[in-house]
Amino acid sequence: MKTIIALSYIFCLVFAQDLPGNDNSTATLCLGHHAVPNGTLVKTITNDQIEVTNATELVQSSSTGKICDNPHRILDGINCTLIDALLGDPHCDGFQNEKWDLFVERSKAFSNCYPYDVPDYASLRSLVASSGTLEFINEGFNWTGVTQNGGSRACKRGPDNGFFSRLNWLYKSGSTYPVQNVTMPNNDNSDKLYIWGVHHPSTDKEQTDLYVQASGKVTVSTKRSQQTVIPNVGSRPWVRGLSSRVSIYWTIVKPGDILVINSNGNLIAPRGYFKMRTGKSSIMRSDAPIGTCSSECITPNGSIPNDKPFQNVNKITYGACPKYVKQNTLKLATGMRNVPEKQTRGIFGAIAGFIENGWEGMIDGWYGFRHQNSEGTGQAADLKSTQAAIDQINGKLNRVIEKTNEKFHQIEKEFSEVEGRIQDLEKYVEDTKIDLWSYNAELLVALENQHTIDLTDSEMNKLFEKTRRQLRENAEDMGNGCFKIYHKCDNACIGSIRNGTYDHDVYRDEALNNRFQIKGVELKSGYKDWILWISFAISCFLLCVVLLGFIMWACQKGNIRCNICI
């Protein structure tokens, strides 16, 4: 009996395939868009996480691990700091007259000469680094009545006591140290950088032994500036066997100006000047090795590609670099909203449009058509709407780079002026710049992502409206991105709808006739499917009852024998 009921149910399902609407006089056309099984989450103005078919990472988060030697000229400081190379520390003599785009200072660098300090070390370091050269020109200063070329055991040059090669230590000659008053005009067309110093003896005896006077004084002047330094005699921590010190100063002499040096002792005199050049040279502290490669952007961690607008490798950079932001990732949508395709579409494999889900496997376009007609099913991309979306999305990455560079360069220039005037605010300003860059970057990417999603949705709607205008009353909008076409529409007919050559008048009469022709139960209400399935269920139930009644009647008449065993 159970077998008979099951066969009856299957019989009903088989006949259900001949429901009204599945005959050859109608067709279904659905519009849809590309989808992928696993999309990428991006952020928009209205949504923190929205899935798209494709996205591009905008933040460079790793370096090559080495500093590329091309296209920038890299000068490896090895064991020397830039200031030691500038002064002429004996172990840095190999850097004399060198040039660079980027001077790389190493953590292992050390000084190996007379202990010194620079009152404004960072400014001098930055000044020389930006000049990009250690080119030095000797000048004939006229020092009279004193002994020149003083040296120290703390600054060996070979086996002999020495001193910084770019400086001239003056001390008494015999028992006198006459006042020195020397001038040196700048008749060149470029600025001259003079490095000079003041010696601070550790004891009063050392002071008089070297300079006779109990207290010396050094004054260096130009038409624009004057510096006066009085030595501080006193013991300091021992460095390389000495408790005395040298303080290093510098003076820039403009073209047409004149350098005046006046001293009655303790003067560490210049031997000449360094040529000052304007350019984009710089300095960086890094222990990354220098390798044979090419990269426009260098960080202390190593070189990084500059094909992304942002990076979070290091806030210190040199060259054409992405802007530093706090975010580890910022994804730019380069595809449409992703709605993965449902894997099952009911018993009979119905097709659905873009309102329900996207379509996977559309490799030849972003938008397209699927149809179901008397010749079967098929799918084709709509290249025109696809190209319209791609044309507007192409170049989006370049537009983001342009926008960020323009905005951030303005901020950078503005804050650079503040940093130069107010040293106490330097760290605060740097943090503020990074906060602004990070906020602007996130906002800009969210705006672009919102535009991309709105754009791709708009192209889908345009294609749907274009199809609706072609079909008019020949088809019915099914509400899921599909149209039910009320006339026979073979593959050629479907193709004419796709390419925009469909003639609605040709099929108008047939479509109207089919719309109003009653075939079984053809209801327009939203309860159509429910009523159809209920009617089939009742029919199947009645069939089962009839069969069961026949079997019971046959058993009573003796035509069928039924044995029940326990």
Swiss-Prot record:
GO terms for biological process: clathrin-dependent endocytosis of virus by host cell; fusion of virus membrane with host endosome membrane; fusion of virus membrane with host plasma membrane; viral budding from plasma membrane; virion attachment to host cell. Residues 1-16 form the signal peptide. Homotrimer of disulfide-linked HA1-HA2. This is Hemagglutinin. Glycans are attached at residues 24, 38, 54, 79, 142, 181, 301, 499. The keyword Transmembrane helix applies. The keyword Membrane applies. Residues 552-566 are cytoplasmic. Belongs to the influenza viruses hemagglutinin family. GO terms for cellular component: host cell plasma membrane; membrane; viral envelope; virion membrane. GO terms for molecular function: host cell surface receptor binding. Major glycoprotein, comprises over 80% of the envelope proteins present in virus particle. The extent of infection into host organism is determined by HA. Influenza viruses bud from the apical surface of polarized epithelial cells (e.g. bronchial epithelial cells) into lumen of lungs and are therefore usually pneumotropic. The reason is that HA is cleaved by tryptase clara which is restricted to lungs. However, HAs of H5 and H7 pantropic avian viruses subtypes can be cleaved by furin and subtilisin-type enzymes, allowing the virus to grow in other organs than lungs. Its main location: virion. InterPro entries: Capsid_hemagglutn, Hemagglutn_HA1_a/b_dom_sf, Hemagglutn_influenz_A, Hemagglutn_influenz_A/B. It is a single-pass type I membrane protein. Palmitoylated. In natural infection, inactive HA is matured into HA1 and HA2 outside the cell by one or more trypsin-like, arginine-specific endoprotease secreted by the bronchial epithelial cells. One identified protease that may be involved in this process is secreted in lungs by club cells. Disulfide bonds join 30-482, 68-293, 80-92, 113-155, 297-321, 489-493. Residues 17-530 are extracellular. The record marks 345-346 as: Cleavage. Pfam families: Hemagglutinin (PF00509). It comes from the Viruses. The chain crosses the membrane at residues 531-551. Binds to sialic acid-containing receptors on the cell surface, bringing about the attachment of the virus particle to the cell. This attachment induces virion internalization either through clathrin-dependent endocytosis or through clathrin- and caveolin-independent pathway. Plays a major role in the determination of host range restriction and virulence. Class I viral fusion protein. Responsible for penetration of the virus into the cell cytoplasm by mediating the fusion of the membrane of the endocytosed virus particle with the endosomal membrane. Keywords: Clathrin- and caveolin-independent endocytosis of virus by host, Clathrin-mediated endocytosis of virus by host, Disulfide bond, Fusion of virus membrane with host endosomal membrane, Fusion of virus membrane with host membrane, Glycoprotein, Hemagglutinin, Host cell membrane, Host membrane, Host-virus interaction, Lipoprotein, Membrane, Palmitate, Signal, Transmembrane, Transmembrane helix, Viral attachment to host cell, Viral envelope protein, Viral penetration into host cytoplasm, Virion, Virus endocytosis by host, Virus entry into host cell.
